[in-house]
Amino acid sequence: MDASEVEFLAEKEQVTVIPNFSLDKVYLIGGDLGPFNPSLPVEVPLWLAINLKQRQKCRIVPPEWMDVEKLEAIRDQERREETFTPMPSPYYMELTKLLLNHAADNIPKADEIRTLVKDTWDTRIAKLRLSADSFVKGQEAHAKLDNLTLMEINTIGTFFTESLNHMYKLRTSLQNPEEGQSQDY
């Protein structure tokens, strides 16, 4: 799975919009949406919120966790803890990117929020790299990585898979040295 596929999954997350149009309930395969009434909040998938915003049909309400004080607390906790802390959304990075790219005018203190989420991401990726380093140096057979998001797993997944394959090959060659040194006379 690549980053665009993770972003696609994130677009299914529900967000609140305040429409400026009227429309009865819309029946889709993935569920019913609406009804849409001017100035009345309604929950819709992120992909629809972005589409409506691009057509100037709504205002997007940022998620509750997308607040400077809450994000500062999350960032500080992430820096304090040795383990990964739970994130406010399994798609926090993707939601932030999409909302700030398409609806920054609807998000108070958008630049600060962008910086705080990036700081949190950088801290978590640094922890992930340290975990991978100690995993490889300790010649571990398994690892427990709780509270990672799909994008974080996607970022480090290929490296971990390749590392495990190389470690397996090295271990098997060390356990059977005579098999690797056979020569025909």
From Swiss-Prot:
It comes from Xenopus laevis. Required for correct functioning of the GINS complex, a complex that plays an essential role in the initiation of DNA replication, and progression of DNA replication forks. GINS complex is a core component of CDC45-MCM-GINS (CMG) helicase, the molecular machine that unwinds template DNA during replication, and around which the replisome is built. Component of the GINS complex which is a heterotetramer of gins1/psf1, gins2/psf2, gins3/psf3 and gins4/sld5. Component of the CMG helicase complex, composed of the mcm2-7 complex, the GINS complex and cdc45. It comes from the Eukaryota. This is DNA replication complex GINS protein PSF2. PANTHER family: DNA REPLICATION COMPLEX GINS PROTEIN PSF2. One of its GO terms (molecular function) is chromatin binding. InterPro entries: GINS_A (IPR021151), GINS_bundle-like_dom_sf (IPR036224), GINS_Psf2 (IPR007257), PSF2_N (IPR056784). The gene is gins2. It holds the Pfam family Sld5. Gene3D superfamilies: 1.20.58.1020, 3.40.5.50. GO terms for cellular component: CMG complex; GINS complex; nucleoplasm; nucleus. One of its GO terms (biological process) is DNA strand elongation involved in DNA replication.
